[in-house]
């Protein structure tokens, strides 16, 4: 949501219509967590307080009195360190003109509007400079007025019986179209509350721009907040989760029934089956790794009294190993563990033996008679697992999905955000809330520095230092060591990089390779085309069309594939290519089965080779979420008959298309001149070794346009030059006779079709999947019987005795070329 930022449209709502006026901007209001449907409580005490407040302000209008009572009926759960407070009850009205008559409603309304205008003018004149400051610091949701009146407006909508989908459609029409139909209303109300409380994006400071400014800020700042993510621990050797051989991929192999690899960290799944977590917990267990230069840099800030707090999203406890005391582990850590039943706590050493033995540790207080923990690799029934968790097991105090952050985070952050004078973000994508809100929670006047491999487009930093975090920290320490040898001791590399305004020109060898492959494909297309006509062209067309569909899909989240070999700007890695081929194979299986069925109806039976195989339903899902390559064939060692589906796959002809190959696009870091770092023309972005940014446009733009024109005019979906699509598509199979793939859910399928329809400037004639989908809906209507209106299929080579009859039928069915030209 943070990347696809959509401005909320509430222009038709006036804050004074909500019954409470804009309060004094100097008053502090803590943020409220609005849990609709979960924390709606009736309270007589709050009603009495609301009535007492209404009595005290006798000049308050009747509408405000009713709103106050409504507001008093709701209690909301706030931060853990604060008491519950009423929404809308924390704002008081300023007294109105005492000469107003309560009996004259129309006059009251007119006078109220006039008074409101006067008050607004007085506020603007009386508070000098605060209006601009509040506008800049409106991202601070706790001190801004706007989120408060938005929540009061949302509360009014809730009590008037509005449907949450209608509310979402009124403020965010684009987002409302993508809501799932089965989403509960309480979830939507909760989402709306968080959405309206979302802080505004901060504007960049004009006074902080250069790398020298960063060094100056570090030298003079005394209360620095450092927010760290996984990027600071990459060089420590901690295994990753999402690579080909990462934890998630191996987890799916060992636990094929796991609905999603991330369920390993889902609290609800953990309560049902804790085995996946304890099977791989030893790989991320602390004590086996050493701190990185980033950790030592943060420790030096603390030693010199400059560190206000280190907020870390990591659970590796390397901050503790580095000796950092002023640290908040936002997502918990392995340092302690708690019982899931009685909340008994113990330290990490008590679980160490069980963790490394891959056993599920039981609570010594809840199950004192159990001599040994349960082996996580031993197969047990669901009932045994449920009973095991209910009896009490030990869970490390890391924050799982579905759990709240530690109370310490909310308590400390409430004070730190108002006193910090510099924010440094190192190695984090800032996509997980509420930690992602830290940059927007501190005052907008506080400088913010980003040290990361990639840019964060959903946030605005004053200076972006892009590259390997260890390399960047090393250069910062060199700059700081001019007058202090303590910083020089942290330098792990003696080389000092110099600033450069120029990048090396991109290598053109990749261009020549790309054009050579296009020329080779053009020259060899005629001979290959003849061989294609002598084979089962139905499978060829299915293969090419599926390739086109996957190629147009681009990047799809949670789809099992991330890029394609057809139209992606980058060349796919081996893992991505394997994942794509796996999905394409399943698509071809479905299409070939339909083809075989159609051939049986037409009496066109032919010898075909079949292969029986087994596939895991749990692996073949659209929710891989990071699994890029996994074996789809079940081995006898872990085959479970209840989880298998027997399939008959039709083997397509062994015709291997020539994939479109592109040279690897160079990153800006790969074009750095030796011994330099690059200063971008925007004057606040810098590229160091290891950066994953692409700022060169002369590589891909011209080639992409030339390649697109070449494909649209001369080549088919395989890249073979020949007749246009119109000729080839006359006998093609309608891909929409079946779903695109059993792996693709309807939403993703619609997304792919949309990308295909809108992906090119010149839509291909008679080959648009959108047109085929429309035609399929019409064709799928009930018909009396299959007669002559059968979707055209490209048949096998007809025998000599049927050629003449076929030519006669075609001449009768198709109009002369003159008529086609006239049309």
Curated annotation (Swiss-Prot):
Enzyme Commission designation: 2.3.1.286
Q: What is this protein called?
A: NAD-dependent histone deacetylase sirtuin-1
Q: Characterize the pH dependence.
A: Optimum pH is 9.
Comp. bias regions, Pro residues: 814-823
Under the heading SUPFAM superfamilies, the entry gives: DHS-like NAD/FAD-binding domain
Concerning its family, UniProt says: Belongs to the sirtuin family. Class I subfamily.
Keyword Amino-acid biosynthesis appears in the UniProt entry: no
Phosphoserine occurs at 618, 621
Q: Which residues form the active site?
A: 331 (proton acceptor)
What organism is the protein native to?
A: Drosophila melanogaster
Which is one Pfam family of this protein? Answer: SIR2
